[in-house]
Amino acid sequence: MKFKQDFFTQLPEFYSQVYPQGITKPEWLAWSDDAAQLIGLSQPTDELLLGLSGNAAVDGATYYAQVYSGHQFGGYTPRLGDGRSIILGEAIGPNGAWDVALKGGGPTPYSRRGDGRAVMRSAVREFLVSEALHHLHVPTTRALAVIGSDLPVWRESQETAAITVRLARSHIRFGHFEFFCHSERGRADKLIQLLNFTITQHYPHLSCDAAGYKAWFLQVVQDTAKMIAHWQAVGFAHGVMNTDNMSILGDSFDFGPFAFLDTFQEDFICNHSDPEGRYAFGQQPGIGLWNLQRLAQALTPVIPSDDLIAILNQYQEALVQPYLRLMRAKLGLSAVDVPSVEQDKQDLDLIGRFTVLMEKNQLDYTQTWRQLGKLDPTSKHSALRDDFIDVSQFDTWYQAYQQRLGAVADIPAWQTERNSVNPKYILRNYLAQEAIIAVEEGNLAPLHLLQKILTQPFAEHAEHEDLAKRPPDWGQGLIMSCSS
């Protein structure tokens, strides 16, 4: 790997230098070939294993943990920072630079009495969801590898430590800006320094002046809205949408008790620590705006409040338009040639009525969409009909759907197109749990198979139909904890 160290050299007050503590008996548990290509790597090697497990220095790495703050479950925490993630620097790849971070690399000045470690189950989950989201075309950070060990760590019980090697276009979060506005009051100079660095590194087409700052914030609003639109379309619940878990680039970030929907449930809660459902699936669009409002507050020393409010008012449209594009594709609806508020409203109503029917009939979100690939959209009798208990309500919806759909000239091509946007396979929590149990027993095959399937989620994989099934009773609606 070749590194540059722009964050390290240009923002010395934004981190603490800290070196990883190696894990014992490191071994490769998982590796992503296409993530490796992002930073110019090919195959895992013994030398790389030593370096990324913290047992040897990596040439060109500088090792640091970033400081930031954030709103967690609605309350402001003035000092957070990387409590168990150590960044090596920005690795230069063929198409840009990616931060390389060792998540679980050991304690840092921001560990808050924690051990700085990650357990194997959380490392595997982060790796798998990074692979899954990327191949579902959802903006996300990536995971290069999972490195296991025999190092014992204690959570609710004894587990073993592991490291996720995370790749991110940037680790700058909403919380970085909050820290230098609220926690370090009077440091507007540092806020501007961070803002200029972010624009120079990631938005080079913008200028570092008043006009550029406003254009940048609008881009952040749009990118955040687009990310959440993808989440809602694919049925992904993040679970911990604190502002310190929000990437400034609109990439899905910092995965913990996430889940993909099994049975469609608008108020689905995937986080055991969120009993009131602040971060429930259906709340994510609103929380996205709330988090952007907190970021806007932090930017008031730099951008006038009236301008910030005007930009925030564009969030709804920035969310609805990509969501409509994604959902129209899932349903096979033709794109709207001339934007129409009335047509958007009608399509949103059609989509909403369909998901309400899914919830009332307790249907699997992913499987129901996939069924469209078997549908003859010209037939009065839908193959979907048998899945619905309340067939009269479905018939009413289906009639409206056919009317909006219009004529379909090539039915096989239409069906193939539906299968290209409606995945057959998602990372169901129970599948991740089964892979984790197998790893604990020394069997990596289920993990590697699941990874393979998740990198081709739209393919049939007829020999692995079992991985597309609804979860068994024990795996239905699994709720995870933040313990990791």
Swiss-Prot record:
InterPro entries: SelO (IPR003846). The active site is at D244 (proton acceptor). Its EC number is 2.7.7.-, 2.7.7.108. Mg(2+) binds at N245, D254. Its cofactor is Mg(2+); Mn(2+). It holds the Pfam family SelO. GO terms for molecular function: AMPylase activity; ATP binding; magnesium ion binding. Keywords: ATP-binding, Magnesium, Manganese, Metal-binding, Nucleotide-binding, Nucleotidyltransferase, Transferase. It comes from the Bacteria. ATP binds at G81, G83, R84, K103, D115, G116, R166, R173, D254. Belongs to the SELO family. Nucleotidyltransferase involved in the post-translational modification of proteins. It can catalyze the addition of adenosine monophosphate (AMP) or uridine monophosphate (UMP) to a protein, resulting in modifications known as AMPylation and UMPylation. HAMAP family: YdiU_SelO. This is Protein nucleotidyltransferase YdiU. It comes from Shewanella baltica (strain OS155 / ATCC BAA-1091). The lineage of its organism: Bacteria, Pseudomonadati, Pseudomonadota, Gammaproteobacteria, Alteromonadales.
